UniProtKB/Swiss-Prot annotation:
Organism: Danio rerio
Biased composition (Basic and acidic residues): 178-192, 236-259, 379-392, 420-431
Tagged with keyword Repeat: yes
UniProt protein name: Dynein axonemal assembly factor 11
Residue span, CS domain: 276-374
Tissue distribution of the protein: Expressed in kinocilia of hair cells.
Length: 440
């Protein structure tokens, strides 16, 4: 059972900076609360209170909430409307889908002068014949019942038929209460339901541990529980809640169990080594001229080197990166005792230098030594002077001076010509004005 505590209210008062004494709106829905308590002492200024979808069997401890305007108690186990006379400012009361069968208890709401809206849909009393006329006539200040507005003509008619409707309602109420007593006696025959009901009211409800069952058996029991017909009573709702709570606790218990990881197969039973890359790192493997295999493993740049574990074997390499295994089969046998590992300070890559066990004799490459600058210049001069100079063959008869290129007598024809300026004729009607300055 969940009790209303100060910590619970403070967590629900985040919109009010965690202050509960000045709280005007409080939402405690779907908390499995089974009793209303402490709210009337800690939150005197409450105007809106949401308590829907809980397990509250009785309306209590709300009489001191003088400023309360809206109270939502839908989807609970309330059977009687009571203890609301002190809520002087109450304007809206929601009791949807409860177990209110004593409709005569609605007469206590006539003391709430500001009550305008009332919701009783989904209760056993809503099925009584003359239910609406009785409520409209008994609570004269109501303006809306079950979301439907009350007209003046409906109210007058209900007041005129109040005596007959009251007699009819009381008869149906008595019949329902007798059936309710039978339901309680039947519930007493089942000790599990009776125990869960008494424990829920006392706040000492305990949930048994789920036994180990197969998946098929659990599904069959779950289907049988929900498909089994049962009366709609507070006991059946508590039984459904207990079943859901057991299932939730069983799921939490399964989640809390440590999950054992299946070990990764690195070497098969026949001795074959497998390639494994659990950390999903990029790598490159190549051979240099010094008869060494170079393995460049792209380890994360900012990871500490203490989280790396390198194991070099003659035919494979195993690197453990933060508990994840990187294993690579080598193309040739190497010397583990002569191998070395280096870590780049810029990229963070891990370089493994693995000398080959069977070294191949390879020709050494010639190294070209750099020569001095003066020798290069002398060599260039020598190379230029050494080859023979090649010239074009020209007919000596065609040789002449540059002056003979253009024949004489044609010079004037090729000179640039100048265009002469033509003067425009002066008009006969032109009169010279001496005041106008000459054009420059």
């Amino acid at each position: 059972m969940v009790r209303i505590s100060e910590d619970l209210i403070r967590r629900r008062a985040e919109h009010n900076n965690g202050e509960i004494f000045s709280l005007e709106e409080l939402s405690l829905h779907q908390q499995d609360i089974q009793r209303i308590e402490h709210i009337h002492k800690w939150c005197r200024d409450l105007k809106i209170l949401y308590l829907q979808n809980n397990l509250i069997p009785k309306i209590e401890n709300v009489g001191r909430l003088k400023k309360l305007e809206y109270l939502n108690l839908a989807l609970n186990n309330i059977e009687v409307i009571e203890n609301l006379e002190g809520c002087e400012s109450l304007q809206k009361l929601d009791l949807t889908v409860n177990f209110v069968g004593r409709l005569s208890s609605v007469e206590t709401l006539k003391h709430n002068l500001h009550l305008k809206e009332l919701y009783l849909v989904g209760n056993p009393c809503a099925e009584y014949q003359g239910y609406r006329q009785y409520v409209v006539a008994t609570v004269p200040q109501l303006q809306s019942l079950d979301g439907k507005e009350i007209s003046r003509a409906e109210r007058i008619q209900a007041l005129q038929e109040l005596d007959a409707v009251r007699t009819r309602v009381l008869q149906q109420e008595t019949k329902y209460l007798e059936e309710r007593e039978k339901q309680k006696s039947n519930a007493n025959e089942h000790p599990e339901i009776n125990q869960s009901l008494s424990e829920s009211q006392n706040g000492t409800q305990q949930y048994p541990e789920s036994s180990s069952k197969t998946h098929t058996e659990a599904e069959d029991e779950e289907r049988e529980f929900w498909e089994k017909p049962c009366p709609f009573t507070p006991e059946s709702r508590l039984e459904a809640h207990r079943h859901l709570e057991e299932k939730r606790r069983a799921n939490e218990k399964e989640k809390e169990k440590p999950k054992t990881k299946t070990p990764r197969t690195l070497i098969t039973p026949d001795g074959r080594v497998l390639n494994v890359n659990e950390p999903k790192l990029d790598f490159s493997l190549f051979e240099d001229e010094n008869n060494c295999l170079l393995l460049d493993l792209h380890v994360y740049r900012h990871m500490d080197s203490s989280l790396l574990d390198v194991d070099v074997q003659p035919m494979y390499v195993r690197v453990t990166v933060k508990g994840k295994v990187f294993q690579l089969v080598l193309p040739a046998e190497v010397k583990p005792d002569s191998s070395s590992a280096q870590r780049s300070q810029t990229t963070g890559h891990l370089l493994l230098i693995l000398p080959l066990a069977n070294e191949d004799v390879k020709p050494k490459k010639r190294t070209i030594r750099p020569t001095s600058v003066t020798s290069n210049q002398n060599n260039k001069k020598d190379t230029r002077a050494a080859p023979r100079r090649e010239l074009l063959e020209v007919d000596p008869g065609l040789a002449g001076s540059l002056a003979n290129i253009v024949p004489k007598g044609q010079e004037s024809s090729h000179n640039p010509q100048r265009c002469g300026l033509e003067e425009r004729p002066v008009s006969k009607d032109f009169v010279d004005d001496p005041e106008v300055p000459p054009l420059m």
